[in-house]
Amino acid sequence: ALGVDAKSAVRSLAHIESGFGRMERFELGEARVTMVLVKNPAGCDRAIDYLASLPDGVTAVFCLNDEIADGTDVSWIWDAAFERLFEPEKKPMSLIVSGIRAEDMRLRLKYAGADEESIRLIHGVTELIDLIAGCKGDVCILPTYTAMLPLRAELASRCGRKEFWK
């Protein structure tokens, strides 16, 4: 319809990169990292759907901040359906929480059905990225906006990518 043949269209589409933190992928050591920005219950539920679709052995990283750019009210995490990750037929996953409101996220996961003792709490970005670098297989990071910024910068640096703004 646009006068573009299918082969050209496919070649062009192969070069499209995902947007800043929106299903953005990184290879870090043996970890296949996907970053999925979350900002509200509806978007978080879609990220949970994606996370639940990943194969066994996935590592889930939840990074929750409450800075102005995130919105200072994080009560929305109670409206997201984290329970779907812990239904009896679901495969177990490694859980990590980080960010300014990591303790709130840990509590939310506990009430969703996660074993609280199995949830790792990591405060520093460097420590978190070091931990992710030691993972094998799929790692899915679900950060809020201000949590994503330093994580993405460190991942980009370690993976030899340019800063998003450059």
Residue map of PLM features:
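ATP-dependent carboxylate-amine ligase
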Residues: 2-7, 11-166
